[in-house]
């Protein structure tokens, strides 16, 4: 079957093309090459010579059809728009509850919970000066805390995302709340969207709690438990965001992320899990930078590559496993403290790139996130940005509206080649686990970060208000929203009372069972985490126990 859409030469094509190039060269004599963040040279004009559609069905196809370049579902956003999943976290569980209810009222169709930095560090609130608590996330250390945070939130109806690194205590607390409310665990939907320990080891050391092999063990146990008890929960979200925000180019980010997905899939297969059963619940989480067309091409290429990896390399038979389901967050790295209102425009461009690339859910950053955690007002503006793009700009009217653009299709092909080269390099190093363990990935990211910084310092790459178009500004930084210190002190005191009054015998038995599970290949560590949460064991106690048994998480530092 001849799939060609355009046959060259067109009548007069060469003459017209040559005339344009001559005219263009006279007007821009001495022009320097323009390159995107992945280093691909961007031409001034694209034509049928760059992409003529010869392999339309093989490389693009139709939405919902392999290789899913144009979208993973037939109707895409025309039939069902993306999920609006705003990241929320500040203060006490009661503070979170007030804000999450208002965000739902403002149009959010799913929720996320960001824990306090003390929680990310693996410790409880009574181990930290209260003035430091709740400034960058919500303090949730027990099932009671989670119950307060989710008061009135319809678990089993609304999708939840837990920013919850290993050993996934937030999910354990959530399951305890569901049991209290008589909610069937099988109805709970959402994602463990910080389960990608390799990305933490490489690029987000705050989230890194357990040793590399310990993290591997707990993740596999977590996936097995969720397959059995939580059929609608996504136990793994492979995170490219950390690596791109650390300095990886968009092409490198996609290559690293897909390499991690290959590693996790192979680990599950070696554990004896069915590949189709596992991949059906795989999801991805990415940064969306302001490099508009590059981001769109990154995601279109990523969909195509993942479909081929899942089907041909990993052997998945179910077409649902070939779908590249991803959440996008507009990039905070692109936001500036200078002239912060300009960030509203930046976030709008980033969000448009995400929508036009066909994401499944999105968080739009608030314009003040370069300064502090967003205020309630700026968070509402961020949600409204999505509503405006969807309902006023009608960006959902056409599926893959940039598909067929000579530029976008050529750039998608070029990004695909760059991404596949990264995957090949990781494969040659023995896979993503080995490549991270020896520092290859960290070195590559460092080199890209340095190159980007040099471009900023020379002015080759411009940021309005930072290295160009600077204006006199009030040097006073707007006050950051902070938790009520008295409320936080009361929260800590109640926590101390809880620890004194709970059953100490039950806690001791649960921690002993958790330690024994960590040292037994026959027991599931995450199952014991869930049981410990219901017995009143705190977040810090569970993390501390597993650190003793499986090793403390020390990331590799590359000089």
Swiss-Prot record:
Reaction catalysed by this enzyme: 3-methylbutanoyl-CoA = 2,2-dimethylpropanoyl-CoA
Enzyme class: isomerase
Key words, A-Z: Isomerase, Plasmid
Record's keyword annotation contains Signal: no
InterPro entries, per database record: Cbl-dep_enz_cat, MeMalonylCoA_mutase_a/b_cat, MMCoA_mutase_a_cat
GO biological process terms on file: acyl-CoA metabolic process
Superkingdom of the organism of origin: Bacteria
Gene Ontology MF terms: cobalamin binding; methylmalonyl-CoA mutase activity; pivalyl-CoA mutase activity
Biotechnology: This enzyme and the derivative PCM-F, a variant in which the alpha and beta subunits are fused into a single polypeptide via a short 11-amino acid linker, have potential applications in bioremediation of pivalic acid found in sludge, in stereospecific synthesis of C5 carboxylic acids and alcohols, and in the production of potential commodity and specialty chemicals.
Residues spanning the signal sequence: none
Gene3D superfamilies, alphabetized: Methylmalonyl-CoA mutase
EC number: 5.4.99.-
Functional description taken from the UniProt entry: Together with Xaut_5044, catalyzes the reversible isomerization between pivalyl-CoA and isovaleryl-CoA, using radical chemistry. Does not exhibit isobutyryl-CoA mutase (ICM) activity.
PANTHER family, sorted: METHYLMALONYL-COA MUTASE, LARGE SUBUNIT, METHYLMALONYL-COA MUTASE, MITOCHONDRIAL-RELATED
UniProt family annotation: Belongs to the acyl-CoA mutase large subunit family.
Assembly mode: Homodimer in the absence of the PCM small subunit. Weakly interacts with the PCM small subunit; an alpha(2)beta(2) stoichiometry seems to represent the active state of the enzyme.
Protein name (record): Pivalyl-CoA mutase large subunit
């Amino acid at each position: 079957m001849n799939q060609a859409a355009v046959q060259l030469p067109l009548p007069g094509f060469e003459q017209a093309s040559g005339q344009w190039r001559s005219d263009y060269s006279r007007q821009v004599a001495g022009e320097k090459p323009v390159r995107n963040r992945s280093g691909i040279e961007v031409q001034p004009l694209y034509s049928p010579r760059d992409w003529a559609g010869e392999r339309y069905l093989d490389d693009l196809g139709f939405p919902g059809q392999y290789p899913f370049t144009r979208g993973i579902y037939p109707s895409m956003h025309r039939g069902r728009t993306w999920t609006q999943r705003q990241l929320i976290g500040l203060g006490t569980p009661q503070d979170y509850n007030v804000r999450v209810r208002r965000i739902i009222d403002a149009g959010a169709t799913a929720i996320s919970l960001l824990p306090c930095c003390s929680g990310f560090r693996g410790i409880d609130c009574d181990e930290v000066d209260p003035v430091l608590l709740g400034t960058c996330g919500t303090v949730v250390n027990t099932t009671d805390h989670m119950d307060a945070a989710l008061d009135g939130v319809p678990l089993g109806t609304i999708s939840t995302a837990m920013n919850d690194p290993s050993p996934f205590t937030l999910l354990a607390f959530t399951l305890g709340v569901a049991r209290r409310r008589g909610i069937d665990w099988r109805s709970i939907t959402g994602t463990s969207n910080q389960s990608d320990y390799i990305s933490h080891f490489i690029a987000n050391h705050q989230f890194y709690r357990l040793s590399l092999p310990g993290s591997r063990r707990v993740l596999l146990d977590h996936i097995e438990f969720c397959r059995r008890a939580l059929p609608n929960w996504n136990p793994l979200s492979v995170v490219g965001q950390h690596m791109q925000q650390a300095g990886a180019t968009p092409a490198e980010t996609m290559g690293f992320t897909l390499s991690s997905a290959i590693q996790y899939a192979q680990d599950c297969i070696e554990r004896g899990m069915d590949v189709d059963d596992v991949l059906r619940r795989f999801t991805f989480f990415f940064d969306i930078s302001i490099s508009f067309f590059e981001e769109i091409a990154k995601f279109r290429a990523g969909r195509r590559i993942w479909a081929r990896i899942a089907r041909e390399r990993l052997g998945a038979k179910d077409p649902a496993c070939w779908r590249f389901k991803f959440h996008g967050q507009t990039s905070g790295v692109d936001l500036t403290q200078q002239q912060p209102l300009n960030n509203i425009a930046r976030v709008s461009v980033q969000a448009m790139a995400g929508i036009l690339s066909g994401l499944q859910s999105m968080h739009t950053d608030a314009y003040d996130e370069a300064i502090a955690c967003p205020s309630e007002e700026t968070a509402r503006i961020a949600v409204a940005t999505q509503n405006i793009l969807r309902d006023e700009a009608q960006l959902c009217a056409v599926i893959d509206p940039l598909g067929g653009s000579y530029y976008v299709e050529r750039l998608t092909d070029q990004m695909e080649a760059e991404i596949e080269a990264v995957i090949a390099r990781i494969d040659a190093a023995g896979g993503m686990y080995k490549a991270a363990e020896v520092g290859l990935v960290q070195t590559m990211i460092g080199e890209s970060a340095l190159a980007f910084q040099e471009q900023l310092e020379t002015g080759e790459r411009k940021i309005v208000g930072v290295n160009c178009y600077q204006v006199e500004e009030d040097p006073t930084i707007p006050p950051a929203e902070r938790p009520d210190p008295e409320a936080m002190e009361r929260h800590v005191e109640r926590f101390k009372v809880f620890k004194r009054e709970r059953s100490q015998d039950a806690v001791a038995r649960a921690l002993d069972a958790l330690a024994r599970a960590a040292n037994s290949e026959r027991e599931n560590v995450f199952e014991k985490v869930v049981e410990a949460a219901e017995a009143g064991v705190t977040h810090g106690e569970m993390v501390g126990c597993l650190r003793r048994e499986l090793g403390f998480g020390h990331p590799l530092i590359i000089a």
